[in-house]
Design a protein with these regions (language model features):
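A detector for short, charged/polar N-terminal pre-domain segments
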Residues: 1-11
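A positively charged, amphipathic N-terminal helix/segment that binds anionic biomolecules
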Residues: 3, 57-69
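A basic, amphipathic helix-loop patch mediating RNA/tRNA/ribosome contacts
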Residues: 9-54
Length: 69
């Protein structure tokens, strides 16, 4: 499980995928999110700009990313 420490109140979903090394670019993040390959807290998420806060969990391609403060 990858852990992302928040520097601000939130991080956007596309940025979180890049920070965790799950994707190589913002374009790649946009594509996998739009295709419904990413879940936030167990629900498929289609918005790249979705704000993630402390306690949120992202799953993509068998990887889990936990958002912490």
């Amino acid at each position: 499980m990858e852990v992302i420490k928040l520097k601000d109140e939130f991080i956007k979903l596309g940025q979180a995928l890049k920070a965790a090394g799950c994707v190589n670019s913002g374009l790649e993040a946009k594509i996998v999110i739009k295709e419904g390959q990413v879940c936030v807290n167990g629900e498929v998420e289609y918005q790249r700009g979705k704000k993630l806060h402390e306690g949120d969990t992202v799953t993509f391609d068998g990887e889990t990313i936990k958002i912490e403060k």
